[in-house]
Amino acid sequence: MAPQMYEFHLPLSPEELLKSGGVNQYVVQEVLSIKHLPPQLRAFQAAFRAQGPLAMLQHFDTIYSILHHFRSIDPGLKEDTLQFLIKVVSRHSQELPAILDDTTLSGSDRNAHLNALKMNCYALIRLLESFETMASQTNLVDLDLGGKGKKARTKAAHGFDWEEERQPILQLLTQLLQLDIRHLWNHSIIEEEFVSLVTGCCYRLLENPTINHQKNRPTREAITHLLGVALTRYNHMLSATVKIIQMLQHFEHLAPVLVAAVSLWATDYGMKSIVGEIVREIGQKCPQELSRDPSGTKGFAAFLTELAERVPAILMSSMCILLDHLDGENYMMRNAVLAAMAEMVLQVLSGDQLEAAARDTRDQFLDTLQAHGHDVNSFVRSRVLQLFTRIVQQKALPLTRFQAVVALAVGRLADKSVLVCKNAIQLLASFLANNPFSCKLSDADLAGPLQKETQKLQEMRAQRRTAAASAVLDPEEEWEAMLPELKSTLQQLLQLPQGEEEIPEQIANTETTEDVKGRIYQLLAKASYKKAIILTREATGHFQESEPFSHIDPEESEETRLLNILGLIFKGPAASTQEKNPRESTGNMVTGQTVCKNKPNMSDPEESRGNDELVKQEMLVQYLQDAYSFSRKITEAIGIISKMMYENTTTVVQEVIEFFVMVFQFGVPQALFGVRRMLPLIWSKEPGVREAVLNAYRQLYLNPKGDSARAKAQALIQNLSLLLVDASVGTIQCLEEILCEFVQKDELKPAVTQLLWERATEKVACCPLERCSSVMLLGMMARGKPEIVGSNLDTLVSIGLDEKFPQDYRLAQQVCHAIANISDRRKPSLGKRHPPFRLPQEHRLFERLRETVTKGFVHPDPLWIPFKEVAVTLIYQLAEGPEVICAQILQGCAKQALEKLEEKRTSQEDPKESPAMLPTFLLMNLLSLAGDVALQQLVHLEQAVSGELCRRRVLREEQEHKTKDPKEKNTSSETTMEEELGLVGATADDTEAELIRGICEMELLDGKQTLAAFVPLLLKVCNNPGLYSNPDLSAAASLALGKFCMISATFCDSQLRLLFTMLEKSPLPIVRSNLMVATGDLAIRFPNLVDPWTPHLYARLRDPAQQVRKTAGLVMTHLILKDMVKVKGQVSEMAVLLIDPEPQIAALAKNFFNELSHKGNAIYNLLPDIISRLSDPELGVEEEPFHTIMKQLLSYITKDKQTESLVEKLCQRFRTSRTERQQRDLAYCVSQLPLTERGLRKMLDNFDCFGDKLSDESIFSAFLSVVGKLRRGAKPEGKAIIDEFEQKLRACHTRGLDGIKELEIGQAGSQRAPSAKKPSTGSRYQPLASTASDNDFVTPEPRRTTRRHPNTQQRASKKKPKVVFSSDESSEEDLSAEMTEDETPKKTTPILRASARRHRS
């Protein structure tokens, strides 16, 4: 068939070209074999050189055959074919303009060019797609083989780099489509198949996941421009819209690519309508359908979000279509629509020059954003806060919205979602950084100016009202105001007899009507009503023909007539007459009337200025009010955020730290609290948190403002000193760690150290507190670089321990702390060969310490005791033979005490008087000093002496090893084996430890030792609280006794009863608190001795004193987490602290359970006992507190097996519950567990246990809440069992257990649970013991009862003898504070040092 006679139909699939489908339709005649392809291609090339692009009409079968065998042919042939087809199409596109412009073109020639065009384009595009398919497969192989050699593999597969060839082909097709090729078709209507052929190729290229890589950017741009031409010239919009929607649903990587394309079409190609079409398609998607297609929804959401960023103005007109998705289930679509709104606010609807309609739109968008700040989905709430953060950062939020959005952010701080909390903090930080009010936000500083300016505004408004009232009163109003009095005056005048009238007002002959009217007006204005009336009566006779005096009605009374005339004169006609006939010579009338009537006009400039001032003042007050409200909100936020500083999530903690840095920089006074509160985080195990704290303090303190290095150093020292004011020991230790870090990294300039020394030595004038803080800072820095203090030791001794009196003990104490940091006690060991750093006994430091302590002993200074404690510690830490120095100090102080006592005796005149008494403070000082020496002597023996013994042994062994003959080393293989196993060293360590223990037990408190001399005195004070009732003395004596008990197990055992008596019965909280610490230390040192007394330790957790409860909580936390005490049901006392009114104690308890939850199944094992104790009517807590505690504890149960086991035990516990309250508690606990389907089956299996209790509404509600939770995450197959459980619940609730039998579900022969009988008082716990499966829930005996002997069958009936702490007691026998013999625990249970796992099992 001649080429001009057939028609080439574009096929949907290549196989269609092999079949005849109609008259004159082109059909491939033969698919050539592979071996014939190269010569046929060469023939095609020869024909092309002769005939041009029309050569394709005779050689299409060759190209078709190449496409057919594409996978099998040689890469070189593929490349040659591609290059040749590019050349053919390019040549055709160059020739077509002339052909299209040829008016003489015949139909057959036009048809030939149309066929050639379609064949050329079809061949080139199919070849492009074939290469693209092979490239995609190669990329998949590359993912398996790795990235190396990828280009080489691609080149091997194709014979060239395909990625570089795509762009030229696409540009060639674009160039071709830009021609007016539609004239080749009949009626100039291009066929849809041709457009689909070209555009379909573009869409297939876009499906490649690598298309959005940076290297493929030229290809993306070429595709975009090709599709842009198809949109503008070939009516491709509808098809493009449908295709884009489909691709967004199926290809997640395409959202940013399509956004870039659509943005380009809308702007450069003027196709704005495509944005509306695509958005309309997305808007019409059913929300339920989107919730089932997360992949498609993700694509739509990403597309809308990025499109709003690029073309917000174009998208804004279509926003109404998307609003339905704000109510849809899918949170991603809500986020996308909200993000689009935010972009429009940022890019289109910002600024002060918006029109009213634009402002309304902006306000609607912001209202929507605020509303979704409370969205049910945490990701939406979080996104809203992020969007508001951007809006605030770009200053696009109207000032009128500040308070509302800040309030939203503050409210979201309490959100359950960590992500929401984090973004709320970021939003508040953005508000601070971009607030329009002030760089310093202190509500205290703002309150004064606000009050002052508000008062000024009120005064200005009052003046304004007064001026307005007096300046321009309406004449009608004035007339109405004067009318009553005017009438009264007129009636009085008219009632007077004719002869008694006052002298009439004279009217001069020269006066005109206007003059007289002016006079009347002035008289009325001055309230001279009588004269005005008389003059009016006179004028009615004088001017009978002139208005208004000529207006006389015979029927009117004289009173009415005169009032009418006066009214006309005052209210207007006089003024109008004056305007018509002004006269300067009329004086009073003209002047008066002009002033009255024109006063507002004359004061217009003044009034305008007044209005401006009032407006300015109103704006100032509004500004101050907004600033004050903003500051108050930030202050409120600080309180909430500070509580989040110890969250488990690292990112939240980092945000909190950054927030406080910013707040501090803005001068908010409460920020210092947060800056101090973050200090303990320096000990965090999370490197990110620790580094955040260090960075915070770098920002706040290491870069102060100042013109010089010295000025900066001064500011830095001043800021750090403020942190030390009223700081606790813990705060100081944290700050010391931070400064140590800075010093080690040389971040503190030498000028800082220099200035600190100048202040410490008083070279720079400073107050005593500043001097003290300087020494403290020097001591902290010495942790990092000991030479800071070590090189100036004598100077430091002179500063704090000089010979002046009275001594500044606070400064002396800080000097001791600073000197202590020059030793290596906190440094990593350099090896046991190096002797510890010690100073000789004769060193001036110890002379001054001995003298200062001894001299201060006899003076009642409260600061002497803490100084003395630090001094004793320093002596034992740095001195050679510290026990000698401290013995001298003890002897010197005791000698002075005896001297004082002797002075008292000699001063008594009558020897029969009561024996001389030592001043209380001296006795307190003496016992406190003895206690400190006792404890430090113990520490010295167990650390320093033991360490030195070990060091010398190691050196001795090394020396012996060196001197041994080589033959001797191999003689004893047994010895070598022991050495390798470390048995020799371990035995030696045990020997040394035994030696130290023997010294402590046998020697330190032996009668010949110095410390032993103080024991009788100490025991006498502790045993006689009535005789020695001074609180400070009691505190010192109890603490000293605890320290003495640490030395010897024998002494400790003999005094434990006394210690625990004081712990329980002392009326002084400080004594109970001190003894709680002491007994905690004893529990670690002598666990077997203290174990029987453990219930007394737990008892302090319910102490009425807040200080004691806090100390007890800390001590028990330490003991339990270190496995030093057995954890039983008594741990419920720790649980009660979760509801303590003191926030610090509650936080301590929460932290305890957080840590305990990390110890395997600890909390799971304890829960049964805790629930039993807390729900016990006599020992437990109220119902609401019980809920709070259990909600926290049950949150730690996360394992399915634990949950299932607990559910079973709790259900069975219903059988043995004694009260309705216990049943409600159990139901609540069940409702708080994270139940699964297996847990629900356990509940169904044990339904009989609680079915008869469901008539109680609260129990029924608790179980219904379980059903609600299970439904939320239930799978379709699990819903049946949930329905079954709910039906059972409802049946039992309405009809009791009999209702179950009416239901045809569950087990047919379910038995009714026996009705729970109330147990008798005598056998209160019997039901629990009888239930084998509920052993874990047996309520232990109340803690308040004493331990019984094994054969005791009933509670002791005797009451404990109470000890009365009274100063009126007469004899020492009656003053005994010890427990009686039967109160002392007899059975001691050794505590085995087993692993935590064994201990818990």
From Swiss-Prot:
Residues 576-596, 1308-1336 have a biased composition (Polar residues). Component of the condensin complex, which contains the SMC2 and SMC4 heterodimer, and three non SMC subunits that probably regulate the complex: NCAPH/BRRN1, NCAPD2/CAPD2 and NCAPG. Interacts with histones H1 and H3. A motif (Bipartite nuclear localization signal) lies at residues 1342-1362. It is found in: Nucleus; Cytoplasm; Chromosome. Residues 576-611, 956-978, 1303-1401 are annotated as: Disordered. GO terms for molecular function: histone binding. The keyword Nucleus applies. Residues 956-971 have a biased composition (Basic and acidic residues). Its main location: nucleus. Residues 1369-1382 have a biased composition (Acidic residues). Phosphorylated by CDK1. Its phosphorylation, as well as that of NCAPH and NCAPG subunits, activates the condensin complex and is required for chromosome condensation. Residues 1-603 are annotated as: Interactions with SMC2 and SMC4. The modification Phosphoserine is found at S20, S585, S1310, S1315, S1330, S1333, S1366, S1367, S1370, S1371, S1376, S1395. The modification Phosphothreonine is found at T1331, T1339, T1384, T1389. Residues 1345-1362 have a biased composition (Basic residues). This is Condensin complex subunit 1. One of its GO terms (cellular component) is cytosol. Regulatory subunit of the condensin complex, a complex required for conversion of interphase chromatin into mitotic-like condense chromosomes. The condensin complex probably introduces positive supercoils into relaxed DNA in the presence of type I topoisomerases and converts nicked DNA into positive knotted forms in the presence of type II topoisomerases. May target the condensin complex to DNA via its C-terminal domain. May promote the resolution of double-strand DNA catenanes (intertwines) between sister chromatids. It comes from Homo sapiens. The C-terminal domain interacts with histones H1 and H3, and may be responsible for condensin complex targeting to mitotic chromosomes. This domain is independent from the bipartite nuclear localization signal, although they are contained within the same region. PANTHER family: CONDENSIN, CONDENSIN COMPLEX SUBUNIT 1. InterPro entries: ARM-like (IPR011989), ARM-type_fold (IPR016024), CND1/NCAPD3 (IPR026971), Cnd1_C (IPR032682), Condensin_cplx_su1 (IPR007673), Condensin_cplx_su1_N (IPR024324). Belongs to the CND1 (condensin subunit 1) family. Keywords: Cell cycle, Cell division, Chromosome, Cytoplasm, Disease variant, DNA condensation, Mitosis, Nucleus, Phosphoprotein, Primary microcephaly. It is linked to Microcephaly 21, primary, autosomal recessive: A form of microcephaly, a disease defined as a head circumference more than 3 standard deviations below the age, sex and ethnically matched mean. Brain weight is markedly reduced and the cerebral cortex is disproportionately small. MCPH21 features include mild intellectual disability, intrauterine growth retardation, short stature, and microcephaly. It comes from the Eukaryota. One of its GO terms (biological process) is meiotic chromosome condensation.
